[in-house]
Amino acid sequence: MGDKGTRVFKKASPNGKLTVYLGKRDFVDHIDLVDPVDGVVLVDPEYLKERRVYVTLTCAFRYGREDLDVLGLTFRKDLFVANVQSFPPAPEDKKPLTRLQERLIKKLGEHAYPFTFEIPPNLPCSVTLQPGPEDTGKACGVDYEVKAFCAENLEEKIHKRNSVRLVIRKVQYAPERPGPQPTAETTRQFLMSDKPLHLEASLDKEIYYHGEPISVNVHVTNNTNKTVKKIKISVRQYADICLFNTAQYKCPVAMEEADDTVAPSSTFCKVYTLTPFLANNREKRGLALDGKLKHEDTNLASSTLLREGANREILGIIVSYKVKVKLVVSRGGDVAVELPFTLMHPKPKEEPLHREVPENQTPVDTNLIELDTNDDDIVFEDFARQRLKGMKDDKEEEENGTGSPQLNNR
C-alpha cells in the first residue's frame, strides 16, 4: 500500500444495480501458477430479491465474425469457463476471503459478495490480432471476461443491460534469468567461386523490453568473386494460431535496408540498431497485440513463455520474435540467418506490504497494520482503460469491440 492508497477498479451494469470491484485489470502468469482473480460484486438488495448472484470467468478464442453466428457458424471457442455462486455462497465455492475482499466488504457493506477464480497455468495469454480497416465485429484473438449477474439459475438468459462485463488480461513478464546470447552463422558456396561466403550475426542479449533498441552485430567474410549489394535487417513477429490446425502468420515490425556493400575477397563488420514499435505498425492487419488498439497501454504482443509439456492445442496464439539478417548477393541469390529473441515487459517491482516507518517514530502494532490501518484508504477508479486521443469512445467496449481480421479469409 503506497501513500496514495490501494487502487481498486470498478464497473457498474448499465441498469446500475450491480457493480464489480477488482484490485487489478492484468493478472500475471508466473508459468507454474497464475494470480487469482479476486473481487466483490455489490448488488442492490431490492433488485436481487429472491435470486442468486453469479459470477463467471471465460477464456475465449475469437477467430471470425460474430455477425455470421446467425448462420449457424461458430466463430468462437471457449477454452475455459468457471462459475461461482457468489450469493448465497455455495459450499463448494466458499473460499477464505483475501485481504482485498475483507477491506472492500467492510467499506461497501453487507450487500457486497466475494468471488475468487483460479486460472489454470496452461491457458493462453491475452492476445489481440490487429484489425484491418474493412473488418467489423469483435477483435480476433484470446480474451478473458468476468461477468456478474443476478438470476434464478445459471441457464437463465441475461440481458446485457442487467449484467457487468469486464475484459481482464492474463500477462507474462520477462524471466529473471535470460537465455544464452543469440548467435547464428552460415556458409554459402557459389558456382565459379573456389572459396565461400561466410555470414555471422549475433544480438547483444536474449531478452529485450518493449521499446528497447535491438543491436544486431553482422560480420561478413566474402572470399567469393561476387559482391554483396545490400544488407537487409528485419525484426519479425511470428504468431502460431493453435486451434484446429496450427497456422503461422509472420509480420515484419522493424526493418532496415542498408546500401552497405561487401566487395569480393573482403570482410565487413557493422552493428545495426532496430527498435520495434507498435506506433510504426498500426496499419498492419493481423499483427498480434497484447491489448486493444484504442487503448494507451497496448503494445506489440509479448513473447509467449511455455511450460514444459504444455498442450499447444489450447494455447490459442503463441507469439515469438526473430531478427533476420539477409545479404543480397549479385547474381547469386540471398544468404540469410535468423536470431530468435524474447520481447517482453520487465517484471514490475512489488509494492511493500507495509509502509516504511522512520527510525524516530514508534512503529504501529502489527495487528493494527493487518486489520485496521488504511481500511478507508481505497481509491476507486473506473475499470475502462485510457483511450488514445481520437479513438472512438464506445459506450460498452466489451460489447462493441474493434474490427477483427478473420482467420478463415487470410
From Swiss-Prot:
GO CC terms on record?
clathrin-coated pit; cytoplasmic vesicle; cytosol; nucleus; plasma membrane; pseudopodium
Tell me the GO BP annotations in alphabetical order: G protein-coupled receptor internalization; negative regulation of Notch signaling pathway; positive regulation of ERK1 and ERK2 cascade; positive regulation of protein phosphorylation; positive regulation of receptor internalization; protein transport; signal transduction; ubiquitin-dependent protein catabolic process
Positions carrying Phosphotyrosine: Y47
Q: Where do the segments described as Disordered lie?
A: 389-410
Any keyword Phosphoprotein?
A: yes
For bias type Polar residues, the affected ranges are 401-410
Q: Where in the cell is it found?
A: Cytoplasm; Nucleus; Cell membrane; Membrane, Clathrin-coated pit
* PROSITE patterns reported for this sequence: ARRESTINS
Q: Which GO terms describe its molecular function?
A: G protein-coupled receptor binding
Residues annotated as binding 1D-myo-inositol hexakisphosphate: K250, M255, K324, K326
Determine if rRNA processing is one of this entry's keywords. no
Q: Where is this region: Interaction with TRAF6?
A: 318-410
Database matches in InterPro entries: Arrestin (IPR000698), Arrestin-like_C (IPR014752), Arrestin-like_N (IPR011021), Arrestin_C-like (IPR011022), Arrestin_CS (IPR017864), Arrestin_N (IPR014753), Ig_E-set (IPR014756)
Q: Which residues does the annotated region (Interaction with SRC) include? A: 1-163
Report keywords, A-Z.
Answer: Cell membrane, Cell projection, Coated pit, Cytoplasm, Cytoplasmic vesicle, Membrane, Nucleus, Phosphoprotein, Protein transport, Signal transduction inhibitor, Transcription, Transcription regulation, Transport, Ubl conjugation
What does the UniProt record tell us about how this protein is modified after translation?
A: Constitutively phosphorylated at in the cytoplasm. At the plasma membrane, is rapidly dephosphorylated, a process that is required for clathrin binding and ADRB2 endocytosis but not for ADRB2 binding and desensitization. Once internalized, is rephosphorylated. The ubiquitination status appears to regulate the formation and trafficking of beta-arrestin-GPCR complexes and signaling. Ubiquitination appears to occur GPCR-specific. Ubiquitinated by MDM2; the ubiquitination is required for rapid internalization of ADRB2. Deubiquitinated by USP33; the deubiquitination leads to a dissociation of the beta-arrestin-GPCR complex. Stimulation of a class A GPCR, such as ADRB2, induces transient ubiquitination and subsequently promotes association with USP33.
Q: Where is motif [DE]-X(1,2)-F-X-X-[FL]-X-X-X-R motif found?
A: 385-395
Q: Phosphoserine-modified residues are where?
A: S404
Q: Where are the transmembrane segments?
A: none
Oligomeric state and partners?
Answer: Monomer. Homodimer. Homooligomer; the self-association is mediated by InsP6-binding. Heterooligomer with ARRB2; the association is mediated by InsP6-binding. Interacts with ADRB2 (phosphorylated). Interacts with CHRM2 (phosphorylated). Interacts with LHCGR. Interacts with CYTH2 and CASR. Interacts with AP2B1 (dephosphorylated); phosphorylation of AP2B1 disrupts the interaction. Interacts (dephosphorylated at Ser-404) with CLTC. Interacts with CCR2 and GRK2. Interacts with CRR5. Interacts with PTAFR (phosphorylated on serine residues). Interacts with CLTC and MAP2K3. Interacts with CREB1.
Family according to the record? Belongs to the arrestin family.
Q: Domains: what does the record tell us?
A: The [DE]-X(1,2)-F-X-X-[FL]-X-X-X-R motif mediates interaction the AP-2 complex subunit AP2B1. Binding to phosphorylated GPCRs induces a conformationanl change that exposes the motif to the surface. The N-terminus binds InsP6 with low affinity.
Q: What does this protein do, in the record's words?
A: Functions in regulating agonist-mediated G-protein coupled receptor (GPCR) signaling by mediating both receptor desensitization and resensitization processes. During homologous desensitization, beta-arrestins bind to the GPRK-phosphorylated receptor and sterically preclude its coupling to the cognate G-protein; the binding appears to require additional receptor determinants exposed only in the active receptor conformation.
What protein name applies here?
Answer: Beta-arrestin-1
**Organism the protein comes from:** Macaca fascicularis (Crab-eating macaque)
